[in-house]
């Protein structure tokens, strides 16, 4: 079967295995959960596909001040102490699931590969 009819034909055997494991997992789909249940399920499974975290020159938790006097939590990742280009990262999750913590390894990886600073915004 061609990949035009079956996009999974292009996947590596390792990715096929990951998808099979996900399909067998005894979890309800996210849309069937309350927001609180979805957050807990996401947090519990966030590390399953994690890549080993890169060691970076800077990893720093920030509190970014905003107009109303409150702050927005964020985390800065940088492979060097020199001035660098900046990527602002907003994790997915529909404003319901995900956090700076669940995307820590990914942001470290992005910073390392792109040789730029990454600010991951927590919301």
What do these predicted regions represent?
Residues 66, 92, 123:
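Active-site donor-binding loop signature of nucleotide-sugar glycosyltransferases
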Residues 74, 83-93:
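Short beta-strand element of the alpha/beta-hydrolase
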Residues 1-72, 76:
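A glycine/proline-hinged amphipathic helix-loop "lid/cap" segment
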Residues 101-121:
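Short amphipathic alpha-helix adjacent to the substrate-entry channel of hydrolases
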Residues 61, 87, 118-120:
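Conserved beta-strand scaffold positions in the cores of enzyme catalytic domains, especially
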Residues 74, 121-123:
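Fold-independent oxyanion-binding glycine-rich loops
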